[in-house]
Amino acid sequence: MIKKLEINNFKSFEQVDLELNNFTLLAGKNSMGKTSVIQAIFAMIQNGNNPFRGEYMNIGKVNELQNAITGNGEIKIKLEYEINDSIEVVEKKITKTESITTKSFEGIKVIYCSSDRIGVEDTYRKYLGDEIIIGKNCDYAFHYLNAHDEDRLDEEKDFVYDTESKLTFGGQVDYWLNKIMGYRVKAKEIEKTEFIQVLYSNEKVPFGMRPKNVGTGVTYITEIIIAALACKENDLLIIENPEIHLHPSGQAEL
């Protein structure tokens, strides 16, 4: 778990210290720095002379990202996190020519649901690697659901809110999707293809409905639920704009 984040001379932040917790919600007007906080964390994960270009983000050259008030000083990001009951501290200093890190940010797996996550489709791609991932745009969330649908959960160890619900991965996805949006979901392999078909149902319509025939927000919230339930101990889940396509009532339930 990330406990503290210090940001200096980065974008709108001249200097800021943030205390983070198991669950941290960033809220505010546009251009207030919410995404910049996420980008600062990614800068600690990505390597190279310009850590602002890589797998999780590509936001430009260092001189474009330095705070306009402080000028051309170095960008400094310091991160304190807890893993396996130990506190680790990582600091990175970034200039136009190099990036110097005190130590690498290790041991924490990141699951990132970007604001550009995939939405309503007729079919969704399978992940072709060995261990199925969610993907930063939730590209493979429904393949993950298909693969782990019947995985049994332990109510003592796993995140189970209602022990009367079905104690499988898919059962918990359905529990939360029904609680928030009033739907259930099924992800099925399309034989002899590299694609997954997704069907929704509810109490009024028990047969499968295509994603295009239900509200757009249903698909977006389903991806978030899958990503959240896929997390293991010590994982870091980052969701950008979780409220996309949700009615205010759905936002409140989320």
Language-model segments: residues:
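Phosphate-coordinating catalytic segments in nucleotide- and nucleic-acid-processing enzymes
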Residues: 47-227, 232-233
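Switch/communication elements of ASCE P-loop NTPase nucleotide-binding domains
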Residues: 1-52, 175, 190-254
